[in-house]
């Protein structure tokens, strides 16, 4: 096995970049060529069917069977012209990935042959086995029926030879078994609530869109090195490994020159993404060695989420073509930054106004403050629930580790906005002349005046206002954005409804509309003041202060999930029509079960590696030292031999003590798992794994990492951090 390590290291050094030919056309020419977008709809659909489909997409109007058949026929024709032979309903089960089953475009022709067929009923609905996906007990094997149903708002696309049709996934009894269905409901809820509030300022607003711009961080590791690390292969992260002498302390990787092999991967990925209509815009080195980031232009939230899931699948596929494996785990390497997926979220109207962007008139700025304060109130009211939405066994390694936002939800606003809210809270005057941008003269030749945002950036804040949007930074790199987005949009929708009810009640008593709005805003600012924090979220002082403010400070992931079932959460979800108590209970069962299984797999892999690699390596090196000590005694007088071999004796004893501890702790961990596995309650089982198994794994790792420092490098079988992080 040690020979394998050195072979893959040598092979990785010798690999050349797989050059990607530059596309002859500009990106705008091939953008969306594999997407059944409105341009394709107009070309391939009858006029009446096109108009009805567009109306369904824009306004949610139902589609009749005749229109569905026409759409299916046009979609099939376009897809087959592009080389597609199969179709699939593409959905997002509660596994955090995607699912698909491919069927060919063929049916019997009644004459012993086949013909290509795709009817509206196949487009609209299919019946996957719901019991085979995480469902929290909603579906059993003996009652397995589930339905996938077409989502017309997200266009179909082609991957390889398959037409992929975005769908929701529900149980036979109607409960959602995916992320897309509740996300769509949350987006509709925030649309209705925001439109109602917008009418205070502009009665022409008919629709409000939630926008999402995600920033996908990831690591790339040479596939040979990846294959030689069973922990990476099985869990997505290194369960052991001492920090490299050099990691990110020189701060020389962030925004540095992109390595050649990596650049060719990025170019290949971008071309495929653009062909699939994903508007990728930014690529750069991240803070940690071999860590990178990809970000698109923001899009409507549902479509943006589909595109993020699609881009993660593309990254896994294309990285292998370039001899890499992409790591989307939140913390694949100890001691260097983990990976997140910042979710830039905003609301905008069909009249072209970003609701969280300052305006030019006092009325515009009152609208701006109205929506910002309502978002803050929603985040304050449901801060525990928002934390639950981004919590997982994998993200727990990253949050609060002085590299990512802490596991306490707070909001950074910046100096200017903070002063505006403070002024509004404490004074009777209403001056809303707030600048959107302010100039900065740098006094450097040939550098023009910069327009700077009216907020600074606070990297320690999990939910920061950044000029015209909020940046939810606590989302993990492997997560489905919908988990966080459905909670955020539903919470904001619920708060906007409450706000409107309070304002309307004051107007009904004869109070002026704007005076009523300001009065309710002032009250809400005072009530949600605890969520506002512009300081250092990494500090111990903030943890104590957050507890004093009544913010949720729980750090145990299984207990964090309890927030979904709080009375306030259930009321919010049910009143907005996003999810029922039964659906929430089922999802929590899935969350606890997934947490347990991920820790369970890691513990089993760690135990196997310990017994099959670590202890044999350590004892082999120990034996060579013992042999050396015996030879010293044969060669030198006793006193001199004892002196010359004293350091080796210390190492021999150190190895013995550590291997004994590791073996005993692994045995203890195995027994603890057996006991935990017998617990029937998924919640209690997850708590047992968190409280008992995780600390044992950390203790085992500590001693393994110490052994790595003393065991002969030629004997060590597993690629080390310096190889995993610095070979590109």
Model-derived segments and spans:
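Eukaryotic, polar/proline-rich low-complexity intrinsically disordered regions
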Residues: 2, 7-12, 33-39, 98, ...
């Amino acid at each position: 096995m040690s020979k394998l390590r050195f072979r893959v290291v040598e092979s990785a050094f010798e690999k050349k970049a797989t050059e990607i030919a530059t596309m002859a056309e500009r990106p705008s020419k091939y953008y969306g060529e594999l997407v059944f977008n409105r341009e394709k709809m107009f070309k391939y659909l009858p006029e009446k069917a096109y108009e009805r489909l567009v109306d369904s997409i824009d306004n949610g109007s139902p589609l009749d069977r005749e229109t569905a058949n026409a759409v299916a026929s046009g979609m099939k024709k376009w897809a087959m012209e592009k080389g597609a032979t199969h179709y699939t309903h593409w959905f997002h089960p509660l596994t955090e990935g995607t699912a698909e089953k491919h069927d060919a475009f063929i049916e019997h022709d009644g004459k012993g042959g086949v013909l290509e067929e795709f009817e509206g009923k196949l487009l609209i609905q299919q019946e996957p086995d719901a019991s085979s996906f995480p469902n929290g007990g909603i579906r059993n094997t003996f009652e397995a029926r589930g339905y996938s149903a077409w989502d017309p708002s997200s266009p179909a696309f082609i991957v390889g030879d398959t037409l992929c049709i975005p769908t929701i996934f529900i149980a036979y009894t109607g409960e959602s078994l995916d992320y897309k269905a509740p996300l769509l409901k949350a987006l509709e809820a925030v649309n209705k609530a925001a439109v109602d509030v917008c009418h205070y300022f502009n009665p022409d607003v008919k629709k409000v869109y939630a926008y999402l711009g995600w920033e996908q961080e990831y690591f790339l590791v040479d596939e040979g090195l990846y294959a030689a690390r069973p922990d990476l292969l099985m869990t997505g992260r290194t369960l052991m490994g001492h920090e490299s002498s050099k990691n990110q302390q020189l701060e020389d990787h962030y925004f540095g020159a992109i390595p050649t092999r990596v650049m060719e991967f990025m170019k290949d990925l971008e071309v495929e993404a653009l062909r699939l209509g994903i508007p990728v815009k930014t690529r750069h080195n991240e803070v940690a060695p071999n860590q990178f980031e990809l970000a698109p232009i923001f899009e409507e939230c549902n479509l943006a989420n589909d595109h993020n899931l699609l881009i993660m699948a593309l990254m896994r596929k294309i990285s292998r073509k370039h001899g890499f494996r992409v790591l989307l785990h939140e913390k694949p390497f100890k001691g260097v930054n983990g990976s997140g997926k910042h979710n830039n979220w905003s609301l905008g109207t069909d009249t072209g106004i970003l609701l969280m962007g300052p305006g030019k008139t006092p009325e515009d700025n009152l609208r701006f403050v109205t929506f910002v304060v309502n978002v803050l109130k929603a985040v304050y009211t449901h801060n525990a629930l928002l934390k639950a939405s981004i919590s997982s066994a994998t993200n727990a390694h990253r949050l609060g580790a002085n590299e990512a936002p802490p596991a306490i939800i707070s909001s950074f606003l910046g100096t200017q906005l903070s002063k505006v809210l403070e002024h509004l809270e404490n004074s009777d005057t209403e001056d809303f002349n707030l600048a959107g941008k302010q100039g900065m003269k740098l006094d450097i030749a040939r550098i023009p005046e910069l327009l700077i945002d009216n907020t600074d950036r606070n990297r320690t804040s999990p939910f920061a206002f950044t000029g015209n949007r909020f940046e939810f930074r606590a989302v993990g790199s492997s997560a489905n954005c919908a988990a966080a987005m459905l909670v955020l949009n539903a919470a904001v929708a619920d708060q906007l409804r409450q706000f409107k009810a309070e304002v309307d009640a004051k107007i009904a008593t004869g109070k002026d509309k704007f005076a009523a709005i300001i009065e309710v805003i002032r009250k809400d600012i005072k009530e949600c003041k605890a969520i506002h924090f512009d300081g250092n979220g990494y500090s111990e002082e903030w943890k104590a202060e957050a507890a004093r403010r009544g913010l949720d400070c729980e750090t145990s992931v299984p207990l964090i999930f309890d927030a979904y079932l709080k009375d306030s959460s259930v009321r919010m979800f049910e009143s907005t029509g996003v999810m029922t108590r039964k659906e929430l209970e089922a999802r929590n069962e899935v969350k606890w079960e997934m947490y347990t299984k991920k820790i369970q797999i890691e513990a089993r892999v760690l135990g196997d590696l310990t017994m099959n690699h670590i202890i044999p390596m350590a004892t082999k090196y120990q034996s060579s030292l013992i042999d050396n000590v015996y030879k010293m005694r044969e060669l030198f007088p006793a006193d001199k031999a004892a002196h010359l071999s004293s350091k080796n004796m210390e190492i021999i004893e150190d190895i013995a003590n550590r291997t004994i501890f590791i073996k005993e702790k692994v045995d203890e961990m195995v027994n603890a798992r057996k006991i935990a596995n017998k617990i029937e309650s998924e919640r209690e089982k997850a708590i047992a794994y968190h409280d008992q198994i995780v600390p044992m794994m950390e203790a085992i790792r500590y001693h393994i990492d110490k052994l790595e420092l003393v065991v002969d490098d030629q004997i060590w079988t597993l690629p080390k951090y310096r190889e995993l992080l610095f070979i590109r």
